[in-house]
Swiss-Prot record:
Subcellular location: Cytoplasm, Cytoskeleton, Microtubule organizing center, Spindle pole body
Protein's recorded name: Tubulin gamma chain
Alphabetical UniProt keywords: Cytoplasm, Cytoskeleton, GTP-binding, Microtubule, Nucleotide-binding
Chief location of this protein within or outside the cell: cytoplasm
Protein family according to the UniProt entry: Belongs to the tubulin family.
Organism of derivation: Microbotryum violaceum (Anther smut fungus)
PANTHER family: TUBULIN
């Protein structure tokens, strides 16, 4: 029986990515823009039910709830080419309008206000599932709605469905050229929720997405449509084993269990190859796609959809790797490729766990024509992800020393009396950075047991001292 997944998209970026994702899933399953199965879609080995359900008239409808605080993006989806695909009851925007003004606190407060209506939609979809496995939250953490409202939803969904998995696709801001001046505040406050309430976070960032667009598409300035296409390609590939199941990794819990050995270190990076012209216009052609070639390319930093330093720290290493290889692949080729990669020490692993690349083989959609035989997605848990969090903390500290823009946050009830929430968020993220650094050492198994470990109430004081110091 398929384990269903409910997709919740929040804010402008989340809904634009979600819209692109659904158009891609329709193409891969032979579903028309109206939700009708095409006459030529005769392959019945796929599991459409994971992401779609059938209405009484047999139309396929996405298991999706779309939420925003202002109507512009949702209106464009409702009037776009896929307007008849979605359940019209599953669109929500705040009747007060106006959005969150790139303010996490405003988005969070709006979440409290609209909670009942939004949760009614989520509950209805969840109860309509036979065997709900979990949720996918799509959002950005730089602005106001995706970060603030997204954070509130994450907390509430975790409380309401404690036994269901929550995986997020979280777009992190470009640290060097962000257009939201308060993005370090918004990012840090969101990070606390992603650390404490999500089971798995797939980190994407605008800087890496733009760089891939420049490299593959020959465009100086990537449009949102182009970067969203990259993200939807990765989302489609990461859910391929759920929709075209094989012997392994055919549910979300199996994938997460293999990638996340410890609960807090659940931030994953992705790499994908090849981004070729059948997916995105103008993309560079990759002439040869053998299994070895694809698996080598996946380990190259330039194919990552997240910006980590190209020269990582000496001790940086992989905690785990799962390669999802799509296409007609001979398992013996996979075995040979893994041996070659191991011989060349292409990937450095943690000293306290298995040093192995896991591989899941899955077929490509028979309805989407590709120019390559093999494509691959790498989901990886790498200690160097902490460098992104360090950058966020450093930028936060610069603003917080001057209490810059703080009055905007103090207008909301959460920050009226004090700024403890900021201190707690900073301490949570600092703890996370330290845990990823501890993962690089052989004695990580004992981490958290020693006298130097700070937890609970001491976190807030620790965060405040770090900023003032």
């Amino acid at each position: 029986m398929p384990r269903e997944i409910l997709t919740v998209s929040a804010g402008q970026a989340g809904n634009q990515i979600g819209s692109e994702f659904w158009s891609q899933l329709c193409a891969e399953h032979g579903i028309s823009k109206e939700g009708v199965l095409e006459d030529w879609a005769t392959d019945m080995t796929d599991r459409k039910d994971v992401f779609f359900y059938q209405a009484d008239d047999e139309h396929y409808i996405p298991r999706a709830v779309m939420i925003d605080l202002e109507p512009r993006v949702l209106d464009s989806i409702k009037s776009g080419p896929y307007k008849n695909l979605y359940n019209p009851e599953n669109f929500f925007y705040d009747p007060q309008g106006g959005g969150a003004g790139n303010n996490w606190a405003k988005g969070y407060a709006a979440g409290e206000r609209v909670y009942e209506e939004v949760m009614e939609m989520i509950d209805r979809e969840a109860e309509g599932s036979d065997s709900l496995e979990g949720f996918m939250l799509l959002h950005s953490i730089a602005g106001g709605t995706g970060s603030g409202l997204g954070s509130y939803l994450l907390e509430r969904m975790n409380d309401r469905y404690p036994k269901k998995l929550i995986q997020t696709y979280s777009v992190f801001p470009d640290a060097d050229s962000g257009d939201v001046v308060v993005q370090p505040y918004n990012s840090l406050l969101s990070m606390k929720r992603l650390t404490n309430h999500a089971d798995s976070v797939i980190v994407l960032d605008n800087a890496a997405l733009s760089k891939i667009c420049q490299d593959r598409l020959h465009v100086q300035v990537a449009s949102f449509a182009q970067t969203n296409q990259l993200v939807s390609t990765v989302m489609s590939a990461s859910t391929q084993t759920l929709r075209y199941p094989g012997y392994m990794n055919n549910d979300l819990v199996g994938m997460i269990a293999s990638l996340i050995p410890t609960p807090r270190c659940h931030f994953l990076t992705t790499s994908y190859t090849p981004f070729t012209s059948d997916k995105i216009e103008q993309a560079k052609a990759v002439r040869k796609t053998t299994v070895l070639d694809v698996m080598r390319r996946l380990l190259q930093p330039k194919n990552r959809l997240v910006s980590m330093p190209t020269t990582p720290s000496r001790h940086a290493c992989y905690i785990s790797i799962l390669n999802i290889i799509q296409g007609e692949v001979d398992p013996t080729d996979v075995h040979k490729s893994l041996l070659r990669i191991r011989e060349r020490n292409s990937a450095t692993f943690i000293p306290w766990g298995p040093a192995s690349i896991q591989v899941a083989l899955t077929k490509q959609s028979p309805y989407v024509q590709t120019t390559h035989k093999v494509s691959g997605l790498m989901l990886a848990n790498h200690t160097n992800i902490a460098s992104i969090f360090k950058r966020t903390v450093a930028q936060y500290d610069q603003l917080r020393k001057r209490n810059a823009f703080m009055p905007q946050y103090q207008k909301e009830a959460m920050f009226e009396k004090n700024l403890d929430e900021f201190d707690e968020a900073r301490a949570t993220v600092q703890d996370l950075i330290e845990e990823y650094q501890a993962c690089e050492k052989a004695d990580y198994i004992d981490y958290g047991a020693g006298p130097g470990y700070v937890k609970g109430e001491d976190r807030r004081e620790k965060g405040r001292e770090a900023v003032e110091g």
